[in-house]
Structure formats: C-alpha cells, structure tokens
C-alpha cells in the first residue's frame, strides 16, 4: 500500500519518467537554490533525493527574482540515452507581464554535470518536451498580456530540432482549455492512434484539476474527455488531499499506469497548508473508450493506493541529526537565489559548526544568509 503524499513538504508540479527499472520525479523549487529537485525510486513508494541539476550560475542565477518566482514546473524526459530537462526561470509574475524564460539542459547521467542551457522562448511557462519517434515537440502555455484578453491564452506546440538546438517551424495553438480556465502544465502522450494532451486547469488553489483531451493529429483539434476532469478535489472540501492537479503519468514494465500530481494538506477549517504543495500518486487505467480513469473510481484523489507490482526497494534513511563535521552540505539543504553560497557560509571556519556570515536584509531579493 502506498500512502500519499509520496513526496512530503515543498515538492510541487511533479514530472515523472521511467528509465528501465528506475523512476524519477522532478519538482519545482521557485526561488530556492539549487534549482529543480529530482527524486528517485524503484517501487514508486520509497523515494530519495538524487539530483539538483541547476547548481551553477550558468544554468541558474536568481539574484533579484521576486518571491515565488524562479523555477516553475520543470519537465523531465529521456530519449536515446540522454536525459532532457526543460525549465522556466520566472523573473516577474505580478501585474500584466510575466518574464518567464524557458530553457533546455541535457545530461547522460541523472546526477551528472548538466549541459549549458539552451534558451528556447519566453512566451509563457510550464514547458514540456514530447519525444515522438524521430521528432521532438516543445509545448508551453502562452501568457497573453494584452488588456481584455484571457492571460492563459492556450497551449502552444512547436517542433524542436536537436541538431540546431532551436525551435523550428510554425507555432500551433492546439488547446484553449475548458470552462475552468487557467489552462497550463501541458504533457503529451501517444497511445495507439491518439495523441493525449494532459493539462492542469482551475488555478493552483482549491479549484485545481487535471483535464485530458485527445486528437489523431498532433496539431489538433483536441476533444476533451466527455466524462469531465480526470482528477480534482474542488467539489469535496472534506478530502485530506486538496488542490489536486498539475500532474504527469508513467507506465510500469507490466503496463500499469500511475499518475503523479500536486496536492496540499490544509489544517482543518483554515485552508492553510504549512507543508506547502506536495506530490501524490494515483493508480489509473485506460477504459474501453480510451480515456484514462482512476482505478478506484471517481475523480477525487485517494490517500492510499494499492501496491504497485514492483519489488519493494526502501532506501537508507537520512540521519535525524547532522553533525557539521563534513566537507559539503548534504543535498537536502537549500538557500535563496544565489549560485554563490560560499559567500555567506563556512564549514571549516569552526570545526563541527555551520557558520553563517551576515548579508542583506530579510526583504532583500539578492543575497541573504539563509540556509
């Protein structure tokens, strides 16, 4: 039995892949450094943090980024022996404009030295990369800043060329979303004769949901699942897992389908979630009409999920107490914005201690001594 959430605490916007017998989930980190957290599992139940790819200035420098900006909704994929990571560095998110720059980096090892970033576009956020045979397709939601227009302007699709390292060809707006609005977080999948488009809708608060649409042509038009949302908590305030949405799916070697999604666990009656947005998992199946459904029925998230048909693989637990007689900080430590933490801390100045050097004020958005 798998108990949700599988990634507790601040781990929103999960993107999941399987590489042979290994499963990886990438999650957002916003203004916390290093950027993007990647967890690893072999049984979909036990997870460990194995990589934080955006760990040098060339890949990410968030000095000056406002609160809640930075890394939004990464997308992790794998093709022909290479890991691909698409990510957004948001420089501003208030008002009518959003400065959201989308990049691609690659690596042959999940915990290796990731390549120099390739800037793809800056037209929106929640980017995704879909590998379709010998073609690769880039998706993102488009942010429409024009007065009088829906800022969530639809899901854009454009081909990515591996040789030139650029987007190429026409841009297609393939899906404008449903009446829920706030259409974002696109992921594409191919099954039999259909392309399936998964999006998040309703905003990332208590109306959040996941919607499937499909088409026989990758450019659309896409028809929405006539049965409604694949997953949502919006109609049941008594659920322990609220704000369910923004997710991805993965298939096991035995053909079992699992969906990961963000959620939160609010304090009773207060609608406040001190643990932030977390990652949960649900078991799913393809119904006779070719739509993905939750195995347990309905479209609300379950706190427990039947055990996957995989050999249990627990990891050694991290120590509850850390003595600072170490050469470097463990990977579960983070700090704000800067790629140069050596400017404000030391593990050698006093043996067995983590020493912080005072920097800028608490409201500053450049360099604070906070770990």
Model-derived segments and spans:
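Structural motif
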Residues: 33-38, 94-103, 147-157, 205-214, ...
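Blade-edge beta-strand/turn elements of extracellular beta-propeller
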Residues: 1-7, 46-65, 104-122, 159-181, ...
């Amino acid at each position: 039995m798998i108990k949700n959430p599988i990634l507790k605490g601040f781990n929103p916007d999960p993107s999941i892949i399987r590489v042979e017998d290994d499963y990886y989930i990438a999650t957002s980190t916003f203004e916390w450094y290093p950027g993007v957290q990647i967890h690893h599992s072999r049984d979909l139940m036990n997870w460990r943090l194995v990589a934080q790819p955006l760990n040098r200035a060339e890949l990410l420098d968030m000095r000056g980024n406002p609160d809640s900006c930075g890394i939004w909704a990464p997308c992790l994929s794998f093709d022909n022996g290479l890991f691909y990571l698409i990510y957004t560095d948001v420089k501003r998110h208030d008002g009518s404009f959003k400065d959201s720059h989308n990049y691609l980096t690659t690596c042959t090892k999940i915990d290796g030295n990731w390549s120099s970033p390739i800037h793809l576009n800056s037209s929106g956020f929640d980017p995704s990369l879909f590998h379709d045979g010998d073609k690769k397709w880039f998706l993102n939601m488009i942010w429409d800043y024009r007065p009088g227009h829906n800022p969530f302007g639809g899901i854009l699709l454009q081909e990515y060329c591996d040789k030139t390292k650029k987007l190429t060809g026409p841009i297609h707006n393939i899906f404008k979303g449903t009446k829920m609005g706030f259409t974002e977080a696109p992921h594409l999948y191919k099954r039999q004769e259909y392309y399936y488009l998964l999006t998040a809708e309703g905003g990332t608060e208590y109306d959040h949901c996941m919607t499937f649409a499909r088409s026989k042509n990758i450019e659309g038009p896409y028809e929405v699942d006539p049965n409604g949302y694949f997953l949502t908590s919006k109609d049941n305030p008594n659920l322990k897992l609220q704000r369910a949405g923004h997710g991805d799916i993965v298939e096991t070697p035995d053909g079992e389908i699992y969906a990961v999604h963000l959620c939160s666990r609010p304090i009773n009656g207060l609608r406040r979630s001190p643990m932030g947005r977390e990652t949960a998992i649900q078991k799913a199946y393809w119904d006779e009409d070719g739509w993905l459904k939750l195995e347990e029925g309905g479209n609300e998230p379950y706190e427990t999920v039947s055990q996957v048909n995989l050999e249990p693989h627990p990891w050694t637990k991290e120590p509850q107490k850390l003595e600072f007689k170490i050469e470097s900080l463990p990977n579960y430590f983070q700090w704000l914005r800067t790629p140069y933490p050596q400017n404000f801390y030391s593990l050698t100045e006093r043996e067995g201690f983590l020493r912080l050097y005072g920097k800028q004020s608490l409201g500053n958005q450049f360099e604070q001594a906070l770990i």
